[in-house]
Curated annotation (Swiss-Prot):
Residues 1-28, 87-103, 169-190, 464-477 are extracellular. Belongs to the G-protein coupled receptor 1 family. Muscarinic acetylcholine receptor subfamily. CHRM5 sub-subfamily. Pfam families: 7tm_1. GO terms for molecular function: G protein-coupled acetylcholine receptor activity. This is Muscarinic acetylcholine receptor M5. Its main location: membrane. One of its GO terms (biological process) is regulation of phosphatidylinositol dephosphorylation. It comes from Rattus norvegicus. The lineage of its organism: Eukaryota, Metazoa, Chordata, Craniata, Vertebrata. It comes from the Eukaryota.
Length: 531
């Protein structure tokens, strides 16, 4: 494969490679066979676990893992065929399976290896576009599209290598390698070898490295932006807890509380004033009564409410403590100065959240008309006191309003947008960023393993182009085998970087996956029977 030649002699018509027999002692052969067999077994088991995990665990059926599944298929082919055939070729020192088997093996080996590179390239572009174009690209990022990209990766790899490997001898008219050697015929020219190394390894690795650097920078930038967003949310939360500073105090007129009969007469007079607007005298008298009614019941609120975007939790709103002079009598002819405290709730109409507009106690008729309109509840604590207040000419007394803090649960119908929306959006961004970072970590591990395992062999390819005898045969074997080891490392990278893969591997290796599925089924059946 690497182009090395062996000294042969013929014994009874059968070629014997003395150099191959002398190169490796018995224990060396046993050691090489055991080590390579173990690595091959690990590669097969690891990549089969990836496939089974993808099959049995629905959480792993994501678009990104479809690419990992394709990579596992390529690695499985290498673990089953390439590793074992190449080990046999090394230990025997020559190819004994014939030229057709050699060409088929080389075609399968190079197509699978190039498919691994193409899959890594697709994964890198997928991660890059997911990070840099989250809105436009993710809408198109479907399993069907992933399947098309995977199919193209394998198709391109097949077109690049299979026809040239299988048909080269027919194009040039003869086989250009000896029958006991197994290597690609058209790579006997140093310039072609150099060009294929550049195209198959160095260019893809350079592109993947550039993409990963951009992915890393963009991920760090989004992490910083998320930290700034969380900081602004903390500032808003702190401002929300601060008490309102802007308070406007006004006063209102308080009249002696009338008896039940007097209130009924006032209401009748107020109602009659609306019906008799054409009579001048009656209208004047009714208007005076209505004015007394409205003046006595006029009240002004304070504008000490937090802004709408800060209404994430029930806030502490001002409650007005009103001083009210009561002249209610216990019996005819006898006044009572008894102090009484009463708490009432007044529903006042709100428009455009203008809390500075004066509100009114409404008559029953007006309240009925406003029943279907949006209102906000205010609580008033009426404290009856016997001290003197300023009395007006119509018997009403001017009373001050003193604000005090009292927790009030706002009516949900009066709230603006969902108060937890900002927090939910931040949490969603954080979850997306965590997933992106995990995917980037998986990509970085796979890319690093690929570069470490493939670089030595491709460096030797470049060196051999200019100096054919500078690379020892042992280094050729070791470098080529190291490329195969990449297929063993990839499943380990999945398990180390993805917790779901790791847990699924563990359950499958311990033969507990079926038990887990049964337990989950029994759990859901038990929950479905609950009332």
């Amino acid at each position: 494969m690497e182009g090395e030649s062996y000294n042969e002699s013929t014994v009874n018509g059968t070629p014997v490679n003395h150099q191959a027999l002398e190169r490796h002692g018995l224990w060396e052969v046993i050691t090489i066979a055991v080590v390579t067999a173990v690595v091959s077994l690990m590669t097969i088991v690891g990549n089969v676990l990836v496939m089974i995990s993808f099959k049995v665990n629905s959480q792993l059926k994501t678009v990104n893992n479809y690419y990992l599944l394709s990579l596992a298929c390529a690695d499985l082919i290498i673990g089953i065929f390439s590793m074992n055939l190449y080990t046999t070729y090394i230990l025997m020192g020559r190819w004994v399976l014939g030229s057709l088997a050699c060409d088929l093996w080389l075609a399968l080996d190079y197509v699978a290896s190039n498919a691994s590179v193409m899959n890594l390239l697709v994964i890198s572009f997928d991660r890059y576009f997911s990070i840099t174009r989250p809105l436009t690209y993710r809408a198109k990022r479907t399993p069907k599209r992933a399947g098309i990209m995977i199919g193209l990766a394998w198709l391109v790899s097949f077109i690049l290598w299979a026809p040239a490997i299988l048909c080269w001898q027919y194009l040039v008219g003869k086989r250009t390698v000896p029958p006991d050697e197994c290597q690609i015929q058209f790579l006997s020219e140093p310039t072609i070898t150099f060009g294929t190394a550049i195209a198959a390894f160095y260019i893809p690795v350079s592109v993947m490295t550039i993409l990963y650097c951009r992915i890393y920078r963009e991920t760090e930038k989004r992490t910083k932006d998320l930290a700034d967003l969380q900081g602004s949310d903390s500032v808003a939360e702190a401002k929300k807890r601060e008490p309102a500073q802007r308070t406007l105090l006004r006063s209102f007129f308080s009249c002696p509380r009338p008896s039940l009969a007097q209130r009924e007469r006032n209401q009748a007079s107020w109602s009659s004033s609306r019906r008799s607007t054409s009579t001048t005298g009656k209208t004047t008298q009714a208007t005076d009564l209505s004015a007394d009614w409205e003046k006595a019941e006029q009240v002004t609120t304070c504008s000490s409410y937090p802004s709408s975007e800060d209404e994430a939790k029930p806030t502490t709103d001002p409650v007005f403590q009103m001083v009210y002079k009561s002249e209610a009598k216990e019996s005819p002819g006898k006044e009572s100065n008894t102090q009484e405290t009463k708490e009432t709730v007044v529903n006042t109409r709100t428009e455009n959240s203008d809390y500075d507009t004066p509100k009114y106690f409404l008559s029953p008729a007006a309240a009925h008309r406003l029943k279907s309109q949006k209102c906000v509840a205010y609580k008033f604590r009426l404290v009856v006191k016997a001290d003197g207040t300023q009395e007006t000419n119509n018997g009403c007394r001017k009373v001050k309003i003193m604000p005090c803090s009292f927790p009030v649960s706002k009516d949900p119908s009066t709230k603006g947008p969902d108060p937890n929306l900002s927090h939910q959006m931040t949490k969603r961004k954080r979850m997306v960023l965590v997933k992106e970072r995990k995917a980037a970590q998986t990509l970085s591990a796979i890319l690093l393993a690929f570069i470490i395992t493939w670089t030595p062999y491709n460096i030797m390819v470049l060196v051999s182009t200019f100096c054919d005898k500078c690379v020892p045969v042992t280094l050729w074997h070791l470098g080529y085998w190291l490329c195969y080891v990449n297929s063993t490392i990839n499943p380990i990278c999945y398990a180390l970087c993805n917790r779901t893969f790791r847990k699924t591997f563990k359950l499958l290796l311990l033969c507990r996956w079926k038990k887990k599925k049964v337990e989950e089924k029994l759990y859901w059946q038990g929950n479905s029977k609950l009332p």
